[in-house]
């Protein structure tokens, strides 16, 4: 099947299918506590599941496989469940074949990690590959984010908040996992995600560089929307956390990486913030205005913005609401950021809400119920976890 037609077909179905199945009754899941391997351990800190791993890709993959993925078999079935939820489970074989083709462009370290996860968890490589490429091959992530720079923050430090909006199916939020990676010869970083996810949808590193991905559906006619010969976007953004300390460094690295699809990346360091508007062929920086930058699910830059953009799950309205926090001569509190993220929540599909404080390396995370923006928020001190 032609990849462009396949992507258009699946996107149309997943955004507007009338075959959406009822959500499961919410459940409570907890990872086995205080378990460890030679290169990893899992524990709960302030009611947040934290997996710490270190070493080579194979060693980290072994720890992830044994401690997290093996302990959460239902989470490994999520890609199949989400297709079933939308009534398109028959497309699994297409996603599996497309994902397998994309593995040729995985960074070798990430492929080694994935293979080790499969070996030590018992989850098939096919399921892990689909779980790590489905984001690029379809578009159903609809997120909202905002960064408040130190000049506008009551904390006098950067605040970056985001809602991760993705079908929870009544259970996936319960599998939220903060994985603290301490790879050899790279920066330590925390990825807020799920077991078996190699890349980073949301994260912060030891230097306080933090980021959050927001998918974009459409692009100006004539521009390329998908690149089969690219690195899945979540893996690109993990590379940024492993190698970069500032927004400027991240911009330069991202321009060099082969990119698969269209995304907005909300990014901040301790001094400034921006949104990178990303396509397979371009990376454009949208700078903050008056100390604030907002990010949703559409492009704003004239070079790539469609003439008639799709208003994905009220992306325009969510954007406008968050823009209200750009208040000259006023300081914005963390409580206000959380309040506005709650205002733009997408109900049961808002499965993680978080605020990063780069200056203090703190993460404030809510995930226990949906919409997660309602709280409660628990705080995780990342600085001691980053120590090697």
Located regions from the model:
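Acidic helix-start/capping segments at beta-turn-to-alpha-helix junctions
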Residues: 91, 131-136
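Surface-exposed patches in mature extracellular/periplasmic domains of secreted proteins
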Residues: 102, 125-133, 265
